[in-house]
Amino acid sequence: MCGISGYWGSDRRIAAQLAASLDTIGHRGPDDRGTHVANDVSMGMTRLSIIDLEGGSQPVYNEDRTIAVVFNGEIYNYRDLMRHLIAKGHQFTTRSDTEVLVHLYEEHGARMVTHLRGMFAFAIHDARSGCLFLARDRFGKKPLFYRAHGEGLSFASEIKGLKPYARAAGERWNVSQQAVADYLSLSSVPQPATIYEGVFCLPAGTYATFRDSHLDIQAYWSPTFSPKTSLTYTEAQRETRRLIGESVKLRLRSDVPLGVFLSGGVDSSVIAYEAAQVLGSTLQCFTVSTGGELDESDLAAQTAKLLGVQHHVLPLRLDPVEGLYKVVEHYDQPFADSSAIPSLQIAKLAAEHVTVVLNGDGGDEVFAGYRRYIAAANVSRLSWIPQPMAGKLAAKFGSHSRSRRSPLGFAARFARGLSMAPEERYLAWTSDMFREPDKAAHWVGPPVQATERLVADTLVAGISQLDQQLESDRRINLLSGLLVKMDMACMAESLEARSPLLDHTLAEFAWRLPDGYRVRRGTPKMVLRDAYRAVLPSGVTSGEKRGFEIPLNDWLSGDLKPLLHDLLGSPNARVRSFVDDSLITGLLSGTAFADRNRSYLLYALLVLELWLERESDDAAHE
């Protein structure tokens, strides 16, 4: 795992900032550093050593040094690819997965990416054809940002890595009004946009070629939901077990200490089970103890005892104020998922024991684990209900509970979305944030497009409502939310996170399962539960999804209250450039957003205010 950075262009002032750029992302790889400078390209990396500790330094070159690569990530099938390439006559000087990339590029050109199984973002300088080649993995687990500078191009693993190049070019970046509006609706800035105008994230599942001052981006992967498998339900369970076992085994390759994040949920328990089949009692599992009714450490302990593995329970003691400032510092963009605060601390605690962790991320998006997927599987049967009746049902349910997790809260959200268009329904079911009527009433910035356009872009003809919900989640909440949270939190502590359930081979199998295999008898993620029911505690396979719930209401009325009122209550609050005074006053007094949980939007505005404050301070020091 590494951080990468580079610049292609003739401006030597910009190229000279490579070292400064690498300094800003040094936390992603504290073990080593290397650079490649040739003609109009300067690129480098900071390395977190995982595979081939002695011989895996970068950049890596082909035999005649006409192709160079800097690479962030892991290629899990690199041994198979290496054998294939050696048989083709390629000569290897290391046993690292990085060297596979240069020889695979020689052999297949841009289509090399279709052979890779892993998480990655890398840059290849091809001196023979005079181009820069960039690529990113299918799900977007590893980030890669870029910006054009006249006829040149800079890239980096984090946005902060681009700023030294921008300063040398004399650039001042403008905050994107559209990105702010979308953030207030979604809790994060949706990729490929960023919070800055003119700064972009290379889309997941794409590669790009930069030649003659032109960047050409091409998609190489998109999921397939059909044809549906002909396997019986029992056969589907067996194949699920086989593919997960294979995915976990591939991700256990490491030359440094490795462990598993283990909660009381089925996803991480499945990963721990499969890892234990390979590593036995040497496997280390890490569980966070949060206290309170949502603490899953007892259930995780049952799983660990059953598997006979080493179990570390890490007590989580959160300071919301300190944690909030750390999120603003590390995440580069406004990010309003409050679980980012404990995620940073969990990564710090785990990094004291291991360098690599496996997690259960992606299980919900691959096997349909959220409760809204139950709604999606049934919406076509209930869409006949007229809007007025659906609205009355939503109001009735919502009057009893605004909690997103309560049965009545879920019923209210379901009823509210029944007669909506798919793009409106998606936002109604997934967010308590800024909606289009709110923008019409309270947005004071320049006109912006509706956030529904992002959902509309994910709509696929001819697939079920369940599959559509999964695809929208993959391209919005997973890509710009969960994966960003995990990458930034773990890399801040030089910890590599691997997600076996986001293996593309496994995901493509799961997405081709019939709806009734995934949501069965009103229970989400059923095929995964049933596949492991015989080998995991019943409380794991039969329990409801809890998630990593943060007591946000308590935080905002307790530890964060002084900060909240000092910053947002100030007439000079920077967020007042985007939303009007009446919204902020109403949120602080509790009169606005009476039909939903106002905490989410309040927290998002607080994060945005702190981010804007930090941005202003950074600009003042340039």
Locations of regions flagged by a protein language model:
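Adenosyl-5′-phosphate
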Residues: M1-I4, A20, R167-R172, E197-A204, ...
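Cysteine-centered catalytic environments shared across enzyme families
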Residues: M1-Y331, S343, A347, R533-A534, ...
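Residues that scaffold the ATP/ADP-binding catalytic core of kinase and kinase-like folds
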Residues: H84, Y165, V366-G369, F509
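Active-site adenylate/phosphate-handling loop in enzymes that bind or generate adenylated species
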Residues: R138, Q345-R404, L482-L506
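Acceptor-binding helix/loop patch of EC 2.4 sugar-transfer enzymes
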Residues: I159, V379, R529-D530
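Hydrophobic alpha-helix feature that most strongly marks membrane-spanning transmembrane helices
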Residues: S185, L252, K305, E329-D332, ...
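Short secondary-structure boundary/capping segments
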Residues: V328-E329, R371-N378, A620-E622
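Acceptor-substrate binding/catalytic loop of class I
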Residues: Q333-D337
